[in-house]
Amino acid sequence: MKQYKILLIIADGLGDRPVSKLNGLTPLEAANKPAISDLLKSSMIGLMDPISPGVIPGSDTSHLSIFGLDPHVYYRGRGAFEALGAGATLKHGDVAFRGNFATVNNDLVVVDRRAGRKLEEGEELVKELNEKIKEINDVKIRFYKGTEHRVAVVLSGKGISDKVSDTDPHYEGLKVLESKPLEDSTEALRTAEIINILTRKVFDVLNSSEVNKRRIEQGEKPANIVLLRGAAHYVKLPSFSSYTKLKAAAVSATALIKGICRELGMNVVTPVGATGGIDTNYNAKAKAAIELLKENDFVFLHIKATDAASHDGLVEEKVKAIERIDKVIGTIVDNVGRDNLILMFTGDHATPVEVKEHSGDPVPILLYVPYPIINDNVKDFNEKEARKGSLRIRGLDVTNILLNYSNRAEKYGA
């Protein structure tokens, strides 16, 4: 029996709701999708709950689920995955945080949570922080640059805990929060104290940085604080190949996703020009996926642009991103050959563009199979048509479904 290559494409934050600017259509409905439409003749579509109905997924928990790992078992927090994706090497006992370079005033009130989002000087600022803040109370501190405004911070030492609260207030106009212990333990209290000292030290370093002085002179907001959230102890994950028997690779520019994929043992590729944002190089991602499919059984392609547009409320940009993803799908199918490939296209969660945040809505999902199946008689691939399809699954079902239709699944039982 022929075993097929598997391509899983995730458009981050793909799912949406009717949008007033689109006369009640969703971005997926409004987008022109000729390549996807061409696959419908041999596809099943439907809806997926990344975690379970009504649960609002993070990109971390949803991807764990989609890769076949129950987040209720394996998820400890996002910080460790962000750090791994940003290039950190973690060991047992380390505590990692995800964070943003942000702008605050002298009273530590947040002016811009992302310091303008695009931060070309991020590497310089991380280097300066690492040179000037090496250790607090015998705990080593290390900063790692992520994409755009993002940064990861790793604490290494004895007697530290991830049971501490965020310093990120999550809204502008609010003061940077004081980290507090989330459990009654010496380790949590000590870690919170270290984080609060770190917050002040980071502000002192960045507020006097020559980099930020230049930014102010150029009319840009200074990146003069790091807002921390998502504390997580490092937890070792099983390798993807250990439970799927697949040689796997991933294409992504987003630190969180790269971190998860690397921890799963996938070969992670970030093509030149891939940014993890709206301005990513779609063609470079398509070419990378094509090359990886030559040597791997499973290739995961992650595109963040749809989610970035949604969080910023950019309706037209989300529609354009979907149309560019459609071209990516067409390019890959044309090069690899539709007879050699199982292709799944979905989102990791919904991010309605008028809400600007994740929601617990189910996400449309498409599964293309190159051999005769009972396909779904639908006219398009979108949230409304997906309700007519045969698939109604959870994220945890995805990996097993892909193994089954690629003729790679093993029988369960005698």
From Swiss-Prot:
Its EC number is 5.4.2.12. It holds the Pfam family Metalloenzyme. This is 2,3-bisphosphoglycerate-independent phosphoglycerate mutase. It comes from the Archaea. One of its GO terms (molecular function) is phosphoglycerate mutase activity. Catalyzes the interconversion of 2-phosphoglycerate and 3-phosphoglycerate. It catalyses: (2R)-2-phosphoglycerate = (2R)-3-phosphoglycerate. Keywords: Glycolysis, Isomerase.
